[in-house]
Design a protein with these regions (language model features):
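Hydrophobic C-terminal alpha-helix "anchor/cap" residues
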Residues: 17-18, 26, 185
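Short glycine-biased active-site loop of nucleotidyltransferases that positions the nucleotide triphosphate
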Residues: 34-40
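A short alpha->loop->secondary-structure connector
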Residues: 109-127
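A short, charged helix-loop
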Residues: 122-150
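Conserved nucleotidyltransferase catalytic core and NTase-mimicking acidic/glycine-rich helix/loop elements
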Residues: 142-266
Length: 266
């Protein structure tokens, strides 16, 4: 099986847009550079324009040239947020076997590059005058401790509600919401496990890598049960991972409160 040459595709994209003066630079992010690359990796690119609205729109108009530089797309979707615009493009398996390819490109003015993919590793692949390197040098690649602490406490606050609703779904014999609710707790497990190693996860993606072999077995067993014991085992694992964070993130009292609440529910 021929593997996708992600680097060659990135080079084709850069070649297609580097002649446009409004583009100041292009950087690569995501699994291609953070140690998680595999044959199924997406391509995540950030593009920075000159700092004014007109040149930003001109740079964004290059999205069609970018699509064509990669191949013939089978679908695409555009969205935007405060200072950024994004296009996600999908290519079929006939062009990129075995599963196709997704290319995500985010555009912003140079002064807003930190808003494109915050706290992400990056690699500059085109920098017209060195200004992109200067802008990205100010970007933190890790969430501040205070922000992680805030997320942990938010997860702790919601966990009992997920547990309670999962128990009700179990008693009703309603498995779809049961597993949907357990998925929320699974995400919390992954977040805590990654935080214990000073890493971060997005939802459930590649979260298993932060669990030990025995923890992974306990975690994966939660997909096969539909009873109170399944919830108990998953929350036991969650509490165990939280205890690893008590000192660093000062959440000891919060974890103790969660344990008291879970004891009352389970």
């Amino acid at each position: 099986m021929t593997l996708i040459d992600h680097r060659k595709i990135v080079e084709s994209i850069v070649k297609a847009i580097e002649g446009e003066e409004s583009v100041q630079g292009v950087f690569l992010s995501g699994s291609l550079i953070d140690g998680n690359k595999d044959q199924f990796s997406d391509i995540d690119l950030g593009i920075a324009s000159i700092n004014n609205e007109e040149t930003f729109e001109k740079a964004y108009s290059l999205r069609h040239a970018i699509m064509e530089a990669v191949g013939k797309p089978i679908d695409s979707v555009e969205r935007g947020w405060e200072n950024c615009k994004m296009v996600a493009v999908l290519y079929g398996r006939s062009q990129f076997p075995p599963l196709g390819l997704e290319v995500d490109v985010i555009f912003s003015q140079l002064r807003h590059v930190s808003e494109q993919m915050p706290y992400a590793d990056y690699e500059i692949v085109f920098d017209r005058s060195g200004t992109l390197r200067q802008a990205l040098a100010k970007l933190s690649r890790r969430k501040p401790k205070e922000e992680v602490q805030k997320e942990i406490r938010l997860h702790l606050a919601w966990c009992p509600f997920y547990v309670h609703d999962a128990l009700k779904a179990c008693e009703r014999g309603d498995s779809p919401p049961f597993h949907t609710l357990l998925d929320e707790i699974r995400k919390q497990v992954f977040f805590a496990a990654a935080a214990s190693r000073d890493q971060q996860v997005h939802g459930s993606k590649r979260g298993l890598k932060y669990l030990s072999a025995s923890e992974r077995l306990a975690f994966e067993s939660s997909y096969h049960g539909f009873n109170k014991g399944t919830i108990q085992k998953l929350t036991d694992l969650y509490v165990a991972k939280l205890k690893e964070l008590e000192v660093r993130y000062q959440v000891g009292p919060d974890v103790e409160q969660l344990q008291r609440t879970l004891k009352e529910l389970l």
